[in-house]
């Protein structure tokens, strides 16, 4: 977008779907206000209502979350007939809307070409990737998930014809693979499955990936062959940890045994599972982290897990349901408005040191283009996980499809 558009706009709306986007907005807002002090500023998306008070202190006048499209349209209409200074002090648009909407096909005019985004690597070739969503929100209440404070166990569908038309325009633009960005593709399987069946019918060569929680992989195991038959290449699943006690704290709805069963089912179906993890939590012990590394080795998952997944630290944003656990307040510090989270420390200080060391190691070794196996071995040694098996099962990464930008789930 040319900067002159920012200087001349009456309304500037910033999409804040994730933590990183919100932090980037913090760095940008002073420049925006200096360039156009009279514009009406709006923050919308998942992280907007969670940080409502902070955004308003920064100069944002309207904050919209949940199903935000109608609210954005209403705001734009009001501004078209009313000067910014004459708008009501309190916004009439709901802070969080759960309204069922009739969506329009997204207008992607002016966006960068698909080649500018993350690519898919599979079978030694690279494919251009498109993105769409068949639903928003989630039926579940995992305590650590940023979707939950906004949607509170609700999900909303995007109409099938809108999803397919969005895919259609991206295929015309060169997409060879589609990532479905739904928080959980199986929140509504009777909605989701017909979409991928129609996708495969119209574009037999088009592949796709989805995100599905372990609990749904188990409960809807009969649908896994449908995913395979319609060209699903892999499924991302937020496993988070292999420690059952921590899984209980997070209210994930599965156990380590359940994850291992889901992994077995996926492999039997011929589908790749891409698990994501949060290995560093306030409850993580040193032995639990070492066992986590051993399990990745035993389950032959080293090549399926991006190294950064071995270093992720639990994020506690404003509104996190984890803050409802009384024990958390003894572990956290006051809210950090720059980091947009509550800092915390492990009871065993060695874990905090290890987390930092693992993050630095990964950053350094990825710059050196070290393989996942090489990085994993160094993390193993850093954690003093024991003697590394000389006969460790190695799976060639060339056989596992992956996106060039790892998914932080």
Q: Can you name each region flagged by the protein language model?
A:
Residues 5, 9, 38, 56, ...:
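Radical SAM enzyme core and accessory elements
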Residues 50-52, 140, 189-190, 245-250, ...:
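Flexible glycine/acidic-rich beta-alpha junction loops that bind and position SAM and/or redox cofactors
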Residues 112-272:
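Radical SAM [4Fe-4S] cluster-binding motif and immediate context
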Residues 17, 46, 183-185, 211-215, ...:
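Active-site beta-loop-alpha junctions enriched in small/polar residues
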Residues 1-172:
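Acidic, low-complexity intrinsically disordered segments
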Residues 33-38, 200-206, 300-305:
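Short helix-capping segments at alpha-helix termini
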Residues 52-57, 223, 283-298:
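Catalytic cores of alpha/beta
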């Amino acid at each position: 977008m040319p900067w002159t558009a920012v200087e001349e706009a009456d309304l500037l709306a910033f999409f804040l779907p994730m933590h990183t986007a919100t932090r980037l907005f913090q760095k940008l807002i002073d420049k925006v206000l200096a360039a156009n002090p009279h514009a009406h500023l709006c923050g919308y998306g998942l992280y907007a209502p969670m940080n409502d008070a902070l955004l308003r202190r920064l100069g944002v006048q309207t904050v919209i979350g949940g199903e935000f499209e109608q609210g954005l349209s209403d705001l734009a209409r009001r501004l078209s007939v009313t000067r910014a200074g004459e708008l009501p002090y309190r916004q009439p648009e709901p802070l969080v809307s759960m309204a069922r909407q009739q969506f329009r096909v997204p207008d992607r005019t002016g966006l960068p070409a698909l080649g500018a985004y993350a690519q898919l690597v599979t079978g030694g070739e690279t494919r251009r990737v498109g993105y769409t969503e068949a639903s928003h929100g989630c039926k579940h209440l995992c305590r650590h998930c940023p979707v939950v404070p906004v949607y509170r166990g609700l999900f909303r569908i995007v109409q099938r014809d809108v999803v397919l038309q969005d895919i259609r325009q991206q295929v015309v633009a060169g997409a060879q693979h589609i990532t479905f960005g739904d928080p959980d593709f199986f929140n509504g399987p009777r909605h989701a499955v017909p979409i991928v069946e129609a996708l495969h019918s119209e574009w037999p060569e088009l592949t796709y990936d989805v995100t599905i929680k372990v609990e749904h992989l188990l409960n809807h195991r009969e649908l896994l062959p449908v995913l395979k038959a319609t060209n699903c290449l892999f499924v991302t699943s937020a496993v988070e940890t292999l420690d059952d006690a921590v899984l209980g704290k997070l209210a994930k709805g599965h156990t380590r045994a359940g994850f291992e069963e889901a992994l077995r089912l996926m492999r039997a179906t011929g589908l790749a599972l891409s698990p994501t993890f949060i290995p560093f939590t306030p409850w993580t012990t040193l032995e639990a982290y070492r066992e986590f590394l051993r399990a990745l080795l035993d389950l032959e998952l080293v090549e399926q897990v991006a190294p950064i997944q071995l270093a992720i630290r639990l994020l506690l944003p404003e509104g996190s349901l984890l803050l409802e656990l009384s024990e958390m307040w003894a572990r956290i510090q006051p809210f950090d408005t720059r980091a947009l989270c509550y800092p915390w420390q492990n009871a065993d200080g060695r874990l905090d040191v290890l987390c930092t060391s693992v993050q630095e190691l990964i950053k350094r070794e990825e710059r050196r283009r070290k393989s996942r196996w090489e990085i994993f071995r160094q993390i193993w040694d850093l954690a003093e996980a024991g003697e590394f098996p000389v006969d460790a099962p190695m799976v060639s990464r060339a056989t596992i499809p992956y996106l060039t930008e790892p998914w932080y789930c």
